[in-house]
């Protein structure tokens, strides 16, 4: 079991870029003192049961950190409004305990408003339109997920290209592989969903190789004790298909971190 120290996560004096895997598609980032959360699902279903997740599935390991222990965040980025990304217990805790700005699509924003978040703390994600939050730049990227597959519907899901402390981090979100994705370059860290309802093994490796990302962390697997299609993935199979995986590809335990130097 790996735990995340809330003081380290929220350290204003941090000089590096530290990225923790929260499980699922979720990540916590401290970029030289700036705190970013992506798709955090970090509250239990009930306070007394640390391995019963808030979305109703048992966890393989206890939560590495809880939302109620986080008292500072600059931005919360939500790729879409499914419960394993926009979490029913985590989001209200973060709304109440932090002053974070929430970046999401209009569909997800409706969920946030229903949770009591005021419009001054919501920034609507539009593909390709860069948002500034302090000294960070966040650019939503195109995504197509599940009900959008095979249709012309766009805009309910997104990824995020983040530039913070001189480091570029890309989380494509839950998406099938799209032509636009293959044109993304100059990525320092790729947060790579590998579950079969997202990129899956072959397309995840294809994207990793196309971007030439300097570092890659697989996600969206190995979190819930379930064989549901969106809970499983094979990080070793993905790694076997990635060029120079020994130096680029980092398979983390839930709660484990990767540290990159800030520019």
Task: List PLM regions with ranges.
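Zn-dependent metallo-beta-lactamase
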Residues: 1-58, 233-236, 240-245, 256
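Pre-active-site segment of Zn-dependent metallo-hydrolases
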Residues: 6-9, 34-77, 88-93, 148-149, ...
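Beta-strand-turn-beta hairpins that frame and shape the catalytic cleft
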Residues: 12-17, 30-36, 130-139, 163-169, ...
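Structural motif
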Residues: 34-36, 74-75, 101, 136, ...
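Active-site metal-binding loops of divalent metal-dependent hydrolases
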Residues: 40-42, 81, 143-145, 173-175, ...
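Metallo-beta-lactamase
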Residues: 73-84, 216
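Active-site-proximal loop/helix segments of hydrolase catalytic cores
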Residues: 89, 145-211
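Binuclear metal-ion centers of metallo-dependent hydrolases, dominated by the metallo-beta-lactamase
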Residues: 101, 116-132, 205, 209-263
